[in-house]
Amino acid sequence: MFNLIVSKLFGSRNERFIKKLKPQIDQIAALEPEMEKLTDEQFPQKIAEYKEQVAAGTSLDDILVEVFALVREAGKRSLEMRHYDVQMVGGMVLHSGRIAEMKTGEGKTLVATLPAVLNALSGKGVHLITVNDYLAKRDAEWMGKLYNFLGLTVGVVVHGLSDEERQEAYGCDITYGTNNEFGFDYLRDNMKFYKEQLVQRELNYCIVDEVDSILIDEARTPLIISGASEDATSMYGRVNSMIPLLKRDEDFEVDEKGRSITMTDDGVMKCEQILGIDNLYDSQHISFQHHIMQGIKAHHLFSRDVDYIVKDGQVVIVDEFTGRLMPGRRFSDGLHQALEAKEGVKVESENQTLASITFQNYFRMYNKLAGMTGTADTESVEFAQIYDLEVIVIPTNTAMIRKDFPDSIYKTQQEKYNAIADDIAAKYKKGQPVLVGTVSIEKSELVSSLLKKRKIPHNVLNAKHHQQEAEIVAEAGHKGHVTIATNMAGRGTDIKLGEGVLEIGGLHIIGTERHESRRIDNQLRGRSGRQGDPGSTRFYLALDDDLMRLFGSDRIAGIMDKLGMEEGEPIENGMVTKAIENSQKKVEGHNFEIRKQLLDYDNVMNQQREVIYTLRRDVMYSEDMNEMTAEFVEELFDDAFYAVEEAKGKPLDAETEEMVRVRLDELFGINRNEEFKEALPTREQAEEWVSEILDTLKESAGDHYHEIQRYFLLEALDRNWKEHLLNMDHLREGIGLRGYGQKDPKHEYKREGFELFREMLGRIKENTVRALCHLRIETEVREDEFQHKESKSDLEYSDSENTETKKKPKRRSEPKVGRNDPCPCGSGKKYKKCCGK
């Protein structure tokens, strides 16, 4: 109530924020005559002057007014486009590190040039993220005219570029590209062996176009780089043949909302009978259990032409948010192989994760993050909580006059689609263009077949035909055109009205069902009524639509029966529309919780990832590895001689002495010293001997010694990190069961994950030192001897470690904290720079 009174007296926070910018807008306008007097040659000179000022300490805010005025004039000359005042507001919002909500057709692409130029003056680079390669290339080429006019360089990062081309693109003042390319480049950079191979610079300032699509819709999908594992693929075919024998609700239960499967006791017994095993949950049969669950998911939760298509003998994922094909992307955890077995195509080998990150954690690494979209306000709470981003709604340049008709709700799919076809036919007859939005390829082809029967010409825009996408969208606003499109979210291309269309009502939008997100419905509506044009929208629903079926269509069916409604007669009632919106809010809330859960778990991995990637960078940029190697050796001696130190001068029993000797030989190869075979060396003797080994290696390797140390450390780090990711995946899969033991699964995951991480750091040190102490250089070291091999699986490694089972020597119950390890106090700093000072 208080907020309502304050809003009425002083305007909303949004209105107050925009009002505060008015003086700067006026100052920019006042500079326009001065900027008009500049010659073309003076624009790059002005930019060079501003760069010098920023380098000398001037803040970007201090020169914002002048730079925005300069960019406005540059736009007029290079693009014949002048930034409106509301676009200036959008530019200021983006520069301030917020999200600008701007309606379709308000010129978001042009708005981004203002903060991009201003922030490029720091020399640290600006990244502009788009949803696909086509838009990245289009925007870089289109807006590149403006940047080049100002003397700034512009690059574009798209699929298929070499590392050299990527380095060049990232080295530009302003770089366009997709979220996937930027994220994967970050992961790939953290798998490189030499700093010269890195392609990305510091993550400085980022503007995300269609920010809701990238930071919310795609946030549930982590980016994963994987390599082939050694699991056999034959089991997928075997399990696939038994899935039809299992009955839904009898042998397993399906939760469509949560997209999960639960086996019943009867189902478990049936699987055991079919497979001829005693206990499906026995540790030796655990892989059967995993394959069966994925097989049931493939058959009962994933549909062909909705979640994926089969093309050229391959299962290709369809992006559920944009309807685009995602070639090269695979479902993880064996699900993709289960789908391949279901569809009868070749089953590719399962992959093991080598590196992964979520978009949430990738984009939060930027020093400053901003975004723009036509629809963000409905998700403003999530943007604030997860990304600390405020949403500012930018007023339109001209008033909106589009008509949004109430939803038409029918009892059955057949009635609904007949009504849709009637509506299209009526609009086509008078020449009004129509855009039909569907939620899947299957539905778009159903509408297409109805129109073919009525002999209504039309275009289909979906994941199967997106090569012609730009042409189809460009013509969708022309007189008499009918266009059917899967999810228009993120299409990024405006639909401009053709000649004579304004007079007959503008573009008419038809939604064939409500999406689970209100935002995506709003994006479809927003394709009509751009820049004050007329237009209209209507959604057609049926009680057996997925959203209606999952969230309370029974109540509406009861109302229709009581009203005695005849077949083909729709409900058009505000209360029903409100109930549907409430259902959507429930789904949005449910999805928000899933994303928060993902982030909570990924934050544990993120802290570990930061430590590992920081260590990798330190090693790559280090000019002298001797200090780090010496530190590792000292820590391993502490571990090996722990039992000796605990004995406090007393002689060790024969068994303990033998275990200490075995440990020293595993790590340092001391059995090569004849003297040590007769009596266990003291720590001082062993340290002196290891020091001699490393000195000899240093002398033999000459200038390459630094490279050898770095190679062995990075190789050990990558190998152990890969295994650690697999262990963390297994921990995550089983952690949910801790809830049954009255333990908080997230707390247990964090605690056990940290233990696994500490053990992994110990193994990295062991592997590195062992490799150095067992290395023999018999010939002259060649330049490429220790070059990183592209395929890590090709690396062969051998040492003198005895493979027999041995009793382990007495070791510390708590691992010693290494000087480069994360400090146990939780500060996030290295131990040597925190409590270890």
UniProtKB/Swiss-Prot annotation:
SMART domains reported in the protein's UniProt record: SecA_DEAD, SecA_PP_bind
Primary localization: membrane
Topological relation to the membrane, as annotated: Peripheral membrane protein
Cofactor entry: Zn(2+)
Record GO biological process: intracellular protein transmembrane transport; protein import; protein targeting; protein transport by the Sec complex
Annotated Gene3D superfamilies: Helical scaffold and wing domains of SecA, P-loop containing nucleotide triphosphate hydrolases, SecA, preprotein cross-linking domain
Amino-acid positions noted as binding ATP in the UniProt annotation, renumbered to this chain: 87, 105-109, 494
Free-text cofactor note: May bind 1 zinc ion per subunit.
MF annotations from Gene Ontology: ATP binding; metal ion binding; protein-exporting ATPase activity
Region (Disordered): 788-837
The enzyme's E.C. designation: 7.4.2.8
Enzyme's top EC category: translocase
PROSITE patterns per UniProt: SECA, SECA_MOTOR_DEAD
Positions that bind Zn(2+): 823, 825, 834-835
This protein's UniProt keywords: ATP-binding, Cell inner membrane, Cell membrane, Cytoplasm, Membrane, Metal-binding, Nucleotide-binding, Protein transport, Translocase, Translocation, Transport, Zinc
Entry GO CC: cell envelope Sec protein transport complex; cytosol; plasma membrane
Short name of any one Pfam family annotated for the protein: SecA_DEAD
Cross-referenced InterPro entries: Helicase_ATP-bd, Helicase_C-like, P-loop_NTPase, SEC_C_motif, SecA, SecA_CS, SecA_DEAD, SecA_motor_DEAD
Reaction catalyzed: ATP + H2O + cellular proteinSide 1 = ADP + phosphate + cellular proteinSide 2
Assembly mode: Monomer and homodimer. Part of the essential Sec protein translocation apparatus which comprises SecA, SecYEG and auxiliary proteins SecDF-YajC and YidC.
Record protein name field: Protein translocase subunit SecA
Organism expressing this protein natively: Maridesulfovibrio salexigens (strain ATCC 14822 / DSM 2638 / NCIMB 8403 / VKM B-1763)
